[in-house]
């Protein structure tokens, strides 16, 4: 693996170590666009590092959580570390969700990190990684990062069979075994 070089922008780099069915799949490294969407980037960063605490003061975040929804030629969705099925969400700001920061960045390439939501101003812990350009999501979902290394891992995730446990649910668990900041 090549040494990690921090972006000239000063934006943070975070990583996910992914397993598929309990077997190591590889690492995905993301640049978070703190320079454009600082609140959204910080929310994700703290869930990667475990800095965020729940109302009982316990760390909460992506480590050990699953990608609960995978749709080939579209995206891989995760971030529900509360329920593991897409029904749970929270944020670092003391509320269940926070407002859309802005829509300056577009869904114009594969490998973008974007907020999953339930409508306007409902951003929380859930996110998705695009596997193709998705311009129909522009103005509806906040882009806040991109894959800088490990798109091959995202493609392996995208090719995971689904349907046995639900329409878009992976047949084998796709898990964020470890995560953090570079």
Swiss-Prot record:
Keyword Isomerase tagged: yes
Give the first-level EC class, as a single word: isomerase
Keywords in alphabetical order, please. Isomerase, Nucleus, Rotamase
Where does the PPIase cyclophilin-type domain start and stop, copy by copy?
15-181
Name the InterPro entries on file: Cyclophilin-like_dom_sf, Cyclophilin-type_PPIase, Cyclophilin-type_PPIase_CS, Cyclophilin-type_PPIase_dom
- A GO molecular-function annotation: cyclosporin A binding
Listed name of the protein = Peptidyl-prolyl cis-trans isomerase H
Native source organism of the sequence: Neurospora crassa (strain ATCC 24698 / 74-OR23-1A / CBS 708.71 / DSM 1257 / FGSC 987)
Question: What gene does this protein come from?
Answer: cyp-3
């Amino acid at each position: 693996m090549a040494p990690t070089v921090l972006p000239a922008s000063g934006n943070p780099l975070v990583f996910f170590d992914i397993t598929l069915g309990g077997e190591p799949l590889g690492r995905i490294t993301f640049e978070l666009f703190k320079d454009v969407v600082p609140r959204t980037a910080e929310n994700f960063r703290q869930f990667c590092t475990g800095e965020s605490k729940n109302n009982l003061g316990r760390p909460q975040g992506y480590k050990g959580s699953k990608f609960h929804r995978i749709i080939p030629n579209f995206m891989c969705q995760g971030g529900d570390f509360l329920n593991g099925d897409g029904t749970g969400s929270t944020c670092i700001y003391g509320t269940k969700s926070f407002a859309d920061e802005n829509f300056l960045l577009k869904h114009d390439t594969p490998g973008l990190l974007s907020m999953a939501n339930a409508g306007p101003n409902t951003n929380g812990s859930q996110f998705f990684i695009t596997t193709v350009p998705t311009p129909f999501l522009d103005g509806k979902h906040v882009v806040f990062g991109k894959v800088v290394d490990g798109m091959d891992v995202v493609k392996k995730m995208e090719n995971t069979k689904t349907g046995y446990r639900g329409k878009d649910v992976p047949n084998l668990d796709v898990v964020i075994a470890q995560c953090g900041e570079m």
